[in-house]
């Protein structure tokens, strides 16, 4: 006896096969944070990117600024404070998240880049995040949890409107809620004084 598959049976079999493939992909995404980790050896600095297709990744920065702390002039007090805080963080001692404020061109971003260059040989890494992506901060922190490196999550030009979701995500991390930053993560932000 010869069995024949109708066109409907063939289409149904193909549909089931595709549904199984989709479920497998979705299952893999659910297992992790949904953020593709980078080749950690590729750089000391990374950019968090959320792509239009919903995929997210940490993208290595090819050309990291070579700013050094000694290059920064006339900001000795700020330089000493951020260097001490970063040194404590690197030593596993208590350290604070940082909000730098001030006029444009006063060295705020340069301080953070110089700290990265000072401590990258000891395992410090920087992850730059756009303000609009701060809503993904808990997933980002989960991605680096358990890594031997120490991470500064950095956001430039931080300002929020009332009730903005990114503000709520950042505030929950800073306030130490259930999704608190791990021992290997500090947040260094640049923004307005009232944030």
Task: Provide a role label for each language-model segment.
Residues 142-146, 162-194:
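Conserved catalytic/switch belt of AAA+ P-loop NTPases
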Residues 92-114:
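Walker A/P-loop nucleotide-binding motif
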Residues 118-151, 157-163:
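AAA+/P-loop NTPase substrate/partner-engagement loops
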Residues 93-95, 122-123, 146-149, 181-184:
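Short loop/turn elements that form and flank the Walker-type P-loop nucleotide-binding site
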Residues 6, 10-13, 57-81:
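Dynamic helix-loop-helix/coil hinge segments at AAA+ ATPase domain boundaries and subdomain interfaces
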Residues 4-60:
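Interdomain "pre-motor" coupling segment immediately N-terminal to P-loop NTPase/helicase cores
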Residues 61-63, 87-95:
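Phosphate-binding P-loop
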Residues 77-91:
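Pre-Walker A adenine-sensing motif
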């Amino acid at each position: 006896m010869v069995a024949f598959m109708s066109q409907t049976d063939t289409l149904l079999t193909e549909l089931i096969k595709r549904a199984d493939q989709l479920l497998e992909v979705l299952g893999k995404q659910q297992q992790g944070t949904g953020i593709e980790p980078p080749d950690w050896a590729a750089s000391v600095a990374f950019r968090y990117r959320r792509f239009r297709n919903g995929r997210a990744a940490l993208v290595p920065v090819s050309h990291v600024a070579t700013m050094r702390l000694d290059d920064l002039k006339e900001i000795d007090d700020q330089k000493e404070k951020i260097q001490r805080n970063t040194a404590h963080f690197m030593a596993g001692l208590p350290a604070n998240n940082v909000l730098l404020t001030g006029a444009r061109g006063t060295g705020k971003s340069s301080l953070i880049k110089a700290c990265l260059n000072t401590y990258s040989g000891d395992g410090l890494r920087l992850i730059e995040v756009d303000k609009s992506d701060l809503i993904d901060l808990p997933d980002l922190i989960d991605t680096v949890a358990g890594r031997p490196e120490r991470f500064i999550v950095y956001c430039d030009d931080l300002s929020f409107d009332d009730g903005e979701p990114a503000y709520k995500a950042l505030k929950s991390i800073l306030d130490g809620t259930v999704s608190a930053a791990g021992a290997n993560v500090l947040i260094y932000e640049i923004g307005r004084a009232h944030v």
